[in-house]
Every structure is written in C-alpha cells, then in structure tokens.
Amino acid sequence: MSQTARRLGPQDMFFLYSESSTTMMHVGALMPFTPPSGAPPDLLRQLVDESKASEVVEPWSLRLSHPELLYHPTQSWVVDDNFDLDYHVRRSALASPGDERELGIPVSRLHSHALDLRRPPWEVHFIEGLEGGRFAIYIKMHHSLIDGYTGQKMLARSLSTDPHDTTHPLFFNIPTPGRSPADTQDSVGGGLIAGAGNVLDGLGDVVRGLGGLVSGVGSVLGSVAGAGRSTFELTKALVNAQLRSDHEYRNLVGSVQAPHCILNTRISRNRRFATQQYPLDRLKAIGAQYDATINDVALAIIGGGLRRFLDELGELPNKSLIVVLPVNVRPKDDEGGGNAVATILATLGTDVADPVQRLAAVTASTRAAKAQLRSMDKDAILAYSAALMAPYGVQLASTLSGVKPPWPYTFNLCVSNVPGPEDVLYVRGSRMEASYPVSLVAHSQALNVTLQSYAGTLNFGFIGCRDTLPHLQRLAVYTGEALDQLAAADGAAGLGS
C-alpha cells in the first residue's frame, strides 16, 4: 500500500460517519447524450473501452485506509495499489427504445445501492438503449471523497465545447481542482446555491453547512471585539422578526412553522429518481410578469406539484410545506461586494390552489427572508442561520424515535438551485442534452429536489425514498403541469392581490 496518506477533514468524516444501510452518503449526476450524425453503431463501446484503458489520478485512485472500521480515529485516504478500473466503469442497456421514465428505473436502483468503501468510492455507468440511438452516463461518488461542488467542476472540465474534440481528458484523468472564493459566489436567477457552493447534493450541503454555521456562532461568540456587537445584532434580528408589522416582514417564515408531513419520516434504502427539464427563458418570462425570480417560479411549481402529489396520497397538510434554501447574500458590513452563505426558510404555497397566488406567497417569503439577512453583518448572518436551524435537531430526534412533537417542524424538504455550464457540452462528439443532479435523502428528509441550469435550460432532479413516496415520477410530471398552469394564468391576479 502507498505510504502517502491524506487525513479526512471534519466535514468528510461527518459524511463517512453518516453512512448507514438506509442513509447512503453518495451523490451523483445523470447526463443523457445524443451521438453525432453518422456516428458508428459501436460508439458507446468505444467510449467504454477508452475509459477502461485510461490512467486514473487522485482523488479517483484513493480508498479508505481503514474500511473495516469507518470510525477509526486516523482514517485517511490512501492510494489503492490494487485499483481495478473495470470495477468502476460499467456498461448496461435499456430495452430499446427506452424513454426518460425507463432510464429513471435503473438509475433509481443504482442509487439505492451503497458504494463499496473497501475500494475508491465512485462508479460510472454507461447506459445505452435510449430512443434515437442516445445513451446516458450516470456517475455516483461518496461525499466524503468528492464534495458535490468539486465533483461537478471536474465533470464540467471533462466535457468539451467543441463537438470535434476527441482528446479531452475524462473526469477520472483530472486531479482535484482549486477552489477560489469567486467560485462559490456564482448564482442564477436570485442567488440560490447549493450550500457552500456544492452542486450535486442539496440536502447534504445543508447538513454539512450546519456544522459550519455552528462553528460560525462559536467564532462570533469567541471574538472579544465582535461578540457583543454580533450577539446584540442577532438578538435584535430575532426580536424584529417577531415584531415587524410591515408587509415584507409579515411573510418571514420562522423555524417552527413546518407542518408534520409524510416527507418527515424514517426512510428505507430504496430510492426513486425522476427528472424534468424546462427552458430558462420560459421561467424568466413568468418571473418578469409577476416580479419574481427564476427561483421563486421554480419553488412555486414544485409547490404546485407537491400539492397534487400529496393530495393523491391523502397526505396533504392543511398548512403549507416549508422548504430550506441555501442562499448567497451581501452583508450590510461588506463594502467590497463579497457574499455570505446562509440558509433561509420559505413557503412552497402548497396550501394555495391558485397558481398565481401560490407564486405570490413564495415570492413574499423569500423576499422577507433575504431582506432580513441583508440587515445583518456577516457574523450575525451565520449566527442567525444557526439559530434558525437549531430546532431541526429536535425534528430529527422525533423522527428517529417515532414520536411526533406537539409543535411544528423546522422544514419539510430542501431545494437547491445551482448554476451550470452556459455552453453546450460534448463528449467525443456526442451532445449532452441535460445534467440532472442526483442528490441524497435522510431520515426526516424523504425528498430532495436539486436544480441545475445548463445551456439555457433548468434541470430538475427529484430523489426520494421509494417506500415513503411511491410513484415519484408523478411529482415530476405534476411540476411540469404546475408550470403550464402558471404560464396560462391571468396576469391580472398579480402579486399584489
């Protein structure tokens, strides 16, 4: 075994320790491709053969030093001297011609199986048999090895903007990229990002971010110069959130407003994955009509889809579901244009039947939350976010115990929206049609929705516990129908009514 070793950091250890038979801590991506005109019939075989003959570099060649004991105090990443690329690169086929729903079935099954932590924890699956001669690539990796942001960046670097490029390196030929502060400040349509910039794992980043937020609180309180000011500002913000009577702050969502819901139960190991893709211009046009962001529109149609989906299951709460959102905001004490990563809570308007009024409710709550954060300095933002999320620990404990508390929950699900490549990308001449994030779920979070923009489209990845939420594909379809209803609605209803 190689003598070089890299210790796992606290965040990586958190995801390793969270691994269980029902809560697998891997994330992934699904990318359908269309071959170029005149492509040979064995194009995918050639790509698989090329992949298996490639050189693998770190971190893709690393395995755990003590896979038999995940809690080992000196757990590290070491080079796997017996690395077997044939194990990690796999090929399968749908019954041709397969459609998007049929593609979701094997991806759901693959995502339901844990990675072998005795080996470098990643796999890539080439799936052929899609209608029109198309194929798909599904990649999954353990969050402790590659965080979602880094993984997405490496995947993007392994694709080319040139359809004639046949020499571009594959993702496991690319070492870990550097990460600049600017990378974490990109956003689309209103500033929602996946936690601290990660792309593939909305829920995972929220949980991981909570550790950083708690550390941020400690940093605030541990600073002699800033503790008094920040603590006072935090207290003032919390009080103001309760006392504000103006229209904007009346819509602020607190940390104990989420109804008890089927989404907040214990989960099994089985997963179901579904996708949807919409033109960004369509969402922008609706947002412009109602003075809402792209993210507001996305949340509203998710709310509309969930309203119908849960109603059909007989599980629709009387009160609206509450969503947790990672956001980027500019603190009031930052004159240099820097941003702070935080979390907010917002309504999904699942208690509202009218699509326009649902969008109005969503927009009002996100505006109030972001306005609240903009009134604070950076330290107070971190402390406020930690305080806002603190009751989630009680929610998780009640879920695990099976005893519902008499008070509401903190949030019902996580939604993340992250920027992806603006240009069309190719692998060996085949055009990537979409990039769907495949995130993770956990106890008390049986559903996660992660969005990613790509080449003028917005791609939705729905991942859920199959046993808790049967027929998840219907939710994806209902989200599209909610978009159609919103687009067809009479604009006279407006946000001000």
UniProtKB/Swiss-Prot annotation:
One of the record's GO cellular component terms: plasma membrane
Catalytic activity: an acyl-CoA + a 1,2-diacyl-sn-glycerol = a triacyl-sn-glycerol + CoA
InterPro entries with a match to the protein in the record: Acyl_transf_WS/DGAT, O-acyltransferase_WSD1-like, O-acyltransferase_WSD1_C, O-acyltransferase_WSD1_N
Active site, per annotation: H143
The keyword Signal belongs to this UniProt entry's keyword annotation: no
Signal peptide extent: none
Keyword vocabulary terms for this entry: Acyltransferase, Glycerol metabolism, Lipid biosynthesis, Lipid metabolism, Transferase
Example of a GO MF term: diacylglycerol O-acyltransferase activity
Pathway(s): Glycerolipid metabolism; triacylglycerol biosynthesis
The enzyme's E.C. designation: 2.3.1.20
UniProt xrefs under Pfam families: WS_DGAT_C, WS_DGAT_cat
Top-rank taxon: Bacteria
Catalytic class of the enzyme: transferase
GO BP: biological process involved in interaction with host; glycerol metabolic process; response to hypoxia; response to nitric oxide; triglyceride biosynthetic process
Family per similarity comment: Belongs to the long-chain O-acyltransferase family.
Protein name: Putative diacyglycerol O-acyltransferase MT3584
Organism of origin: Mycobacterium tuberculosis (strain CDC 1551 / Oshkosh)
